[in-house]
């Protein structure tokens, strides 16, 4: 059987002599390519193809239109326009967005890497924070491996009224806060050359109730091995506090982070690392105002109770070592 080739040329291009080496042949609605065996070969391309020749270039065109791609593109464009209204509505309503995320059976993203220093104010609802030598990650609470293994933390009441009550009644439960007070005692020993005593330092620290709230929430959240350090805040005035974590890894549950941020309004809480030691830096945020409606307590009574406590010598030595370690630490701003 002899096939007569059908070729398409530009209008101003002269006809070329027949050459079947790289020429597409059209037979009915199917496109063929010539071969020595004269067996039709169906081309998979439906686009314009350029044929290289020794003479002027020529373009061979398929006779089958690209209807399937056109229909698929229209369907995808229609689907995008339908879902765009839904996602625009979700973006304007954070509660609806949170409800949608909680409704997912399998989370889309379980962990997100972060860099230190990291401001806890950048977290969103249900974000937990994991710090270790393997990296620093934000996780979706309840789905990260650590949350799954440890479960929900046993948090007592940490609303504003409960925190103020614990702050006022710390005189009756002073032994429970001996780790908090031991840091003030160790700081006064370091400041003896400046004729400072523990009572003025205690009064200055307790004048910022949010520092006590922070320690109380961390302790009630199960982190009873933490240590706290107090340093003068030269920028915002008063004191800033470092929460020092023991061990080489830290996991902050999302509920714990939410309670800390709610209790310490007007303070900036930043996660950082210093010489393989993880910590939280708690300092005043000049851009926000702190809560001022907190009853005052008798500092002298607390100091008398503190003097009656028998502090562990190893605890005081540990605090002296930690203060010497963090003397060169520059707090993040």
From Swiss-Prot:
Post-translational modification remark: Phosphorylated at serine residues in the N-terminus. This phosphorylation regulates the localization within the inner nuclear membrane.
InterPro entries associated with the record: Herpes_UL31
Subunit structure: Forms a heterohexameric complex with NEC2. Interacts with capsid vertex specific component 2/CVC2; this interaction directs the capsid to the host inner nuclear membrane to initiate budding.
Molecular functions per Gene Ontology: zinc ion binding
Keyword annotations of the record: Host membrane, Host nucleus, Membrane, Metal-binding, Phosphoprotein, Zinc, Zinc-finger
Role, per record: Plays an essential role in virion nuclear egress, the first step of virion release from infected cell. Within the host nucleus, NEC1 interacts with the newly formed capsid through the vertexes and directs it to the inner nuclear membrane by associating with NEC2. Induces the budding of the capsid at the inner nuclear membrane as well as its envelopment into the perinuclear space.
Alphabetical list of Pfam families matching this protein: Herpes_UL31 (PF02718)
GO process terms (BP): viral budding from nuclear membrane
GO CC term (a single one): membrane
Zinc finger (CCCH-type): 128-251
Chain positions covered by the region annotation Disordered: 45-64
Protein name: Nuclear egress protein 1
Entry's localization field: Host nucleus inner membrane
Family: Belongs to the herpesviridae NEC1 protein family.
Entry superkingdom: Viruses
């Amino acid at each position: 059987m002899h096939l007569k080739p059908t070729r398409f040329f530009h209008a101003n291009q002269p006809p070329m002599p027949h050459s079947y080496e790289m020429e597409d042949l059209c037979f009915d609605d199917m496109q063929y390519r010539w071969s020595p065996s004269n067996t039709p070969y169906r081309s998979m391309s439906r686009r314009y193809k350029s044929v290289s020749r020794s003479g002027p270039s020529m373009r061979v065109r398929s006779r089958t239109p690209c209807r399937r791609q056109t229909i698929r593109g229209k369907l995808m464009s229609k689907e995008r326009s339908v879902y765009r209204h839904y996602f625009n509505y979700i973006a304007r309503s954070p509660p609806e967005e949170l409800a949608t995320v909680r409704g997912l059976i399998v989370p889309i993203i379980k962990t997100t890497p972060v860099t230190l220093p990291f401001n806890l104010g950048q977290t969103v609802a249900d974000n937990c924070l994991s710090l270790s030598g393997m990296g620093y990650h934000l996780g979706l609470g309840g789905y990260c491996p650590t949350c799954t293994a440890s479960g929900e933390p046993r948090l007592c009441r940490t609303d504003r009224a409960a925190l103020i009550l614990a702050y006022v009644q710390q005189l009756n439960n002073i032994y429970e806060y001996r780790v908090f007070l031991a840091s003030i005692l160790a700081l006064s020993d370091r400041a003896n050359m400046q004729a400072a005593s523990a009572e003025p330092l205690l009064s200055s620290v307790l004048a910022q109730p949010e520092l006590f709230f922070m320690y109380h929430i961390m302790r009630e959240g199960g982190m009873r091995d933490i240590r706290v350090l107090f340093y003068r805040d030269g920028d915002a005035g008063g004191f800033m506090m470092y929460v020092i974590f023991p061990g080489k890894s830290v996991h902050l549950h999302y509920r714990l982070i939410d309670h800390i941020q709610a209790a310490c309004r007007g303070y900036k809480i930043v996660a950082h690392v210093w010489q393989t030691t993880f910590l939280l830096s708690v300092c005043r945020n000049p851009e926000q105002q702190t809560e001022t409606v907190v009853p005052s307590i008798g500092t002298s009574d607390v100091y008398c109770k503190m003097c009656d406590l028998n502090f562990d010598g190893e605890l005081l030595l540990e605090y002296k070592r930690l203060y010497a370690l963090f003397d060169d630490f520059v707090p993040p701003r």
